[in-house]
Swiss-Prot record:
Entry protein name: UPF0391 membrane protein Meso_3110
Species in which this protein is naturally found: Chelativorans sp. (strain BNC1)
Localization annotation: Cell membrane
Membrane topology: Multi-pass membrane protein
Transmembrane segments: 4-24, 30-50
Cellular component aspect of the GO annotation: plasma membrane
Amino acid sequence: MLYWALVFLVVAIIAGALGFGGIAGASAGIAQILFYIFLILLVVSLLFGLFRRAR
């Protein structure tokens, strides 16, 4: 998932450099959403790992 966030970020940077503002904004938004989902899943995974060790 982090890979796809980076892909959309690169697409946004390239589109922004070429003057495609709408595509750049959409790609940056998708990258941001995927990154936040990745962070949430990371935190949930860490919490589950800590709870399993506590038992």
